């Protein structure tokens, strides 16, 4: 039996809640063994496709850099759930404190679940590139000053 809308949405929201904790093992526990992760736009310089294992270092880097990190569905942004395709689309707000100051951005997550609807098989993340560009300059300046 295919997962219901509520089951798919619950898995997606649980994944976002675990992601916000920035604990690599918690995040990875929601990803199927064959999960692929895609980050866009390509101007951010991320590999176009990562496996679950390849993404582990990225999650660890986030944990080392942020505290008080929050992810949530943006107010007024109704999730889109495609039951036959087992996909959930979320408009996410991200906020937190980092080594270089306050961070606030937005993402679009497209999550495709496994046949049971319990794990993420494909994670497509589209990030606010203007915020990421400005923030990247802060990071570069921070680490240049330390060297």
From Swiss-Prot:
InterPro entries: Fungal_Meroterpenoid_Isomerase (IPR050977), NTF2-like_dom_sf (IPR032710). GO terms for biological process: terpenoid biosynthetic process. SUPFAM superfamilies: NTF2-like. Pathway: Secondary metabolite biosynthesis; terpenoid biosynthesis. Part of the gene cluster B that mediates the biosynthesis of the fungal meroterpenoid acetoxydehydroaustin. The first step of the pathway is the synthesis of 3,5-dimethylorsellinic acid by the polyketide synthase ausA. 3,5-dimethylorsellinic acid is then prenylated by the polyprenyl transferase ausN. Further epoxidation by the FAD-dependent monooxygenase ausM and cyclization by the probable terpene cyclase ausL lead to the formation of protoaustinoid A. In A.calidoustus, the austinoid gene cluster lies on a contiguous DNA region, while clusters from E.nidulans and P.brasilianum are split in their respective genomes. Genetic rearrangements provoked variability among the clusters and E.nidulans produces the least number of austionoid derivatives with the end products austinol and dehydroaustinol, while P.brasilianum can produce until acetoxydehydroaustin, and A.calidoustus produces the highest number of identified derivatives. Belongs to the trt14 isomerase family. Homodimer. This is Austinoid biosynthesis clusters protein H. The gene is ausH.
């Amino acid at each position: 039996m295919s997962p219901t809308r509520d089951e798919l949405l619950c898995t997606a929201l649980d994944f976002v809640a675990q992601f916000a904790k920035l604990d690599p093992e918690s995040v990875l526990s929601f990803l199927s063994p064959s999960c692929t992760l895609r980050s866009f736009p390509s101007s951010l310089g991320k590999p176009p496709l990562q496996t679950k294992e390849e993404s582990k270092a990225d999650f660890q880097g986030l944990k080392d850099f942020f505290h008080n990190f929050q992810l949530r569905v943006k107010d007024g942004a109704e999730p889109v759930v495609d039951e036959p395709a087992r996909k959930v689309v979320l408009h996410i707000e991200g906020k937190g404190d980092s080594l270089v100051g306050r961070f606030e951005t937005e993402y679009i997550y497209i999550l495709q679940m496994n046949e049971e609807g319990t794990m993420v098989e494909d994670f497509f993340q589209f990030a606010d590139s203007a915020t990421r560009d400005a923030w990247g300059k802060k990071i570069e300046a921070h680490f240049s000053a330390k060297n």
